[in-house]
Amino acid sequence: MSGDAALLAAARSAGLMPQWEDVSGRQCQVAPEVLRAVLQALQPQAEASGTPLHTAICGEAVVLPGTAGAACWVDEAGQQRDAHPDSAGRWPVPLQPGYWHWQQGPRRIAVAVAPHKAWWPAHLDRGWGLAAQVYSLRSAGDAGIGDSAGCTPWLQRLQQHGGQAFALSPMHAGLPPDAGYSPYSPSDRRWLDPLQASLLQAVPVAARAALAVHPALAEAVDAASAARRIDWPAAADLKWRWLRAARLQLQQAQPELWGEVCQWQNHAGAALQDYCALAADVRSGDAQDHAFAQWVAQHCWTQLHSQACNNGAAIGLIADLAVGCAPDGAEARSQASAMLAGLELGAPPDAFNTQGQAWGITGFSPLALRRQGYAPFISLLRAVMASRGGVRIDHILGLHRLWVLPQGASARDGVYLQFPLQDLLNLLVLESWRHRCVVIGEDLGVVPAGIRQQLAARGVLGVDVLPFTRDEAGFLPAERWRRDAVAMPSTHDLPPLGGWLRGRDLRWRARLGEIEDLPSSLAQRRSDVTALADLVHGDCVEDDALGLLASTPSRLALLPLEDALGLRTQVNLPGTVGGHPNWRRRLPLHCNEAALQSRLQHVSAGRDGGHA
């Protein structure tokens, strides 16, 4: 075998794709030096050992290394039931979903048995909800970063108009934020961000007492709360100072409540202790502060989810799961054996990012996941689904393949790394069923043939966004939108519909030198707007487009708060650092409540009167 042939064989054996198809359908070849570099980074995971986990769907039969003799299935409670192979020597798995062990004499093999589909509320057909960038919300005393308290008025509006879901931006624990902060580059996805949890909601007496004792702190909190944009480093420092002061007040003046905090920490056990030790090392400070901060965050979001469900929301809060984590964060450090050490996640060049994207994050190694029985993936799902009614998985295609590149390399010099899609899907569906948690998979961009159909068959909803929901003939009419999807007018990476209609994103990109011929781009956008106006047949394209969205057969429609408020500037401009205020804009201090109520009623009425 020649050197090139051996390299290609080794690459394919490791799950790398030496050839891939770009957005235009062109076949692209990965350079040999890229394959060698990525293979070298994968070598430690390839040599690791562990206990594998088989997965299956209820009613399937699996091939296990046993004999035709007596065997049994053992459930999580230790109860046994007989197991018998079929005529082909395969073993039919139990009909009850769960984590089982097949046992034959001393031989035990773990098998996860998943239901056919992810969970969905039985009586919910065409629901709707709101989507919030939590850090952008406003509430008194938020100290410059929107938090859980800012959700309350929006949950009240949701209840008033019969909505069923409230989708959150990522709430993962972060690194000490700098000016380039992104919620999609977390320190640890298994734990929560205390900067976006309200002390005034969790411990109001202690929080106010801390401000009374420290008047300079109180003054700084008031000033930061009124700011138009987020100063992440300054606001984070302010919130941590307040949190430490509130913890001391709680310990001294409210021993009963402090006892509840300590009881929760004891129940969380070694996992919390390990995280807090790493967080204190990464961020500096006292591990006790981080433990208290996690209680505050857990308390706030659990309370809000319960409140939403008790007020009639069939789904409640929807979490957002980032595709990876910071390579120097707590998650990567605590699970180093499961991570893609020396590799960075990103995206290949496409029509929107001609140089590709390097995201500055790492993720799980598929080789390590298999050898560790998928334990890191399962624990992550359980952490994110806890006290939530849904989870949106950013870049769901990462369950199938991810673009990886050596750290520091150009995003063009990457390669697709394949993941065990069926095993990961089975585990995702099983945990969804166990947690009663809806699953949404963000499937925008270049999607391999058949993947959307596979996800839909397992009850994982895709995402359809108005500017992209079209074919060669133009924008799709409402009845042609996917049923197994979430319908949205925009996302955090796009301008709100009002900004898209006016070309705000194009002007920003031209200002940053990313568009050379702005007049031509604006002319194309005007043509798109005209086509959309012709489709909706209304006097106000923005409102009528929301009406079209509401009338789709999609199982769920989500209205970002920026669209609900009629804003025009987008949250994040992908591919930019510094030139655009990514993740820093806050919602206005005041809004036109009558216009907002009218828009919410418009969407709600469209869902009630649309397709069954």
Where do the protein language model's features map onto the residues?
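Conserved, mostly hydrophobic/aromatic
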Residues: 11, 100, 158, 278, ...
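Acidic/aromatic-lined carbohydrate-recognition and catalytic surfaces
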Residues: 40-44, 59, 75-78, 84, ...
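Extracellular ectodomain segments of secreted/surface proteins
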Residues: 43-70
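Short, aromatic- and glycine-rich surface loops/edge beta-strands on solvent-exposed regions
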Residues: 71, 96-105
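Acidic, His- and aromatic-enriched active-site or binding-groove loops in soluble protein domains
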Residues: 182-212, 331-355, 414-425, 460-472
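Active-site neighborhood of glycoside hydrolase catalytic domains
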Residues: 293, 297-311, 373-460
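Substrate-binding/active-site clefts of carbohydrate-active enzymes
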Residues: 314-376, 380-383, 402-417
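Conserved alpha/beta catalytic core and glycan-binding cleft of carbohydrate-active enzymes
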Residues: 443-568
